[in-house]
Swiss-Prot record:
Entry protein name: A-type potassium channel modulatory protein KCNIP2
Keywords noted in UniProt: Calcium, Cell membrane, Ion channel, Ion transport, Lipoprotein, Membrane, Metal-binding, Palmitate, Phosphoprotein, Potassium, Potassium channel, Potassium transport, Repeat, Transport, Voltage-gated channel
Lipidation (S-palmitoyl cysteine): C45, C46
Major site of localization recorded for this protein: membrane
Region (Interaction with KCND2): 257-270
Protein's membrane topology: Lipid-anchor
Chain positions recorded as Ca(2+) 1 binding sites: D153, N155, D157, S159, D164
Gene inactivation effect: Mice appear healthy and show no signs of cardiac dysmorphogenesis, contractile dysfunction, hypertrophy, or heart failure but are highly susceptible to the induction of polymorphic ventricular tachycardia, including arrhythmia. Myocytes show a complete and selective loss of I(To) current in the heart. This is due to the loss of KCND2 protein in the heart ventricles.
Single Gene Ontology BP annotation: membrane repolarization
Residue numbers carrying Phosphoserine: S9
Keyword hit for Lipoprotein: yes
Length: 270
């Protein structure tokens, strides 16, 4: 999506630093808030602890409230030092609004959470896996985190910037059904050759079972992931050529009510 030159030619991120409040300015309802926190816990650099509610922020003593940084002055020696410690600063807020389906306020909140976990402005695979593992202590999330990292790292340069992160998040949360299914296909297509093999699907499925841990599904047998994949792959590989194309993947998912319901769960996450 962006080359190395983009990560070296950086613009001022002051607009993204302008808010620590919740996305709408009001705390969400219980069910929406719970779903939002559950989803954000699955993503790096954007854990729910980075997004306090407005009521929590205002109720806290002044000394404990999140500090809202003043706008950076490029001519200030102090600000110049602060900026020099950041490896990557995202492009302008207006440009990110054009490229994603997030509002200005939403981008500010997402950037605050990202920067809290990734002060350098980018995250590599090892850091990504470390952050992700905090939310699945009962299992081994390392393999799934690697697959997810590669899906966010669209230009395959070994790092995920804030732009990479919000681009993927925008598709997952605000994209059309086809957009989301295309993103999911890319996640499963591990070698990025344009089709999904049974082995790739099995690798993903095993990583999910490993991540959830044996304590979550104690009754599952070791062969359960393979049986799951065999059943699912037979439905998707419509011409029985041993691979699933993007067309077969989308068509099969659109005809599965459970998958369609799961896609719609993300419509109002943020």
């Amino acid at each position: 999506m962006r080359g190395q030159g983009r990560k070296e030619s950086l613009s001022d991120s002051r607009d993204l630093d302008g808010s620590y409040d919740q996305l709408t300015g009001h705390p969400p309802g219980p069910s929406k808030k719970a779903l939002k926190q559950r989803f954000l816990k699955l993503l790096p650099c954007c854990g729910p602890q980075a997004l306090p509610s407005v009521s929590e922020t205002l109720a806290a003593p002044a000394s404990l409230r999140p500090h809202r940084p003043r706008p950076l002055d490029p001519d200030s020696v102090e600000d110049e030092f602060e900026l020099s410690t950041v490896c990557h600063r995202p492009e302008g807020l207006e440009q990110l609004q054009e490229q994603t389906k997030f509002t200005r306020r939403e981008l500010q909140v997402l950037y605050r959470g990202f920067k809290n976990e990734c002060p350098s402005g980018i995250v590599n695979e090892e850091n990504f896996k470390q952050i992700y593992s905090q939310f699945f202590p009962q299992g081994d999330s390392s393999n799934y985190a690697t697959f997810l990292f590669n899906a966010f790292d669209t230009n395959h340069d070994g790092s995920v910037s804030f732009e990479d992160f919000v681009a993927g998040l925008s598709v997952i949360l605000r994209g059309t059904i086809d957009d989301r299914l295309n993103w999911a296909f890319n996640l499963y297509d591990l070698n990025k050759d344009g089709c999904i093999t049974k082995e790739e699907m099995l690798d993903i499925m095993k990583s999910i079972y490993d991540m959830m841990g044996k304590y979550t599904y104690p009754a599952l047998r070791e062969e359960a992931p393979r049986e799951h994949v065999e059943s699912f792959f037979q439905k998707m590989d419509r011409n029985k050529d041993g691979v699933v194309t993007i067309e077969e993947f989308i068509e099969s998912c659109q005809q599965d009510e459970n998958i369609m319901r799961s896609m719609q769960l993300f419509d109002n996450v943020i």
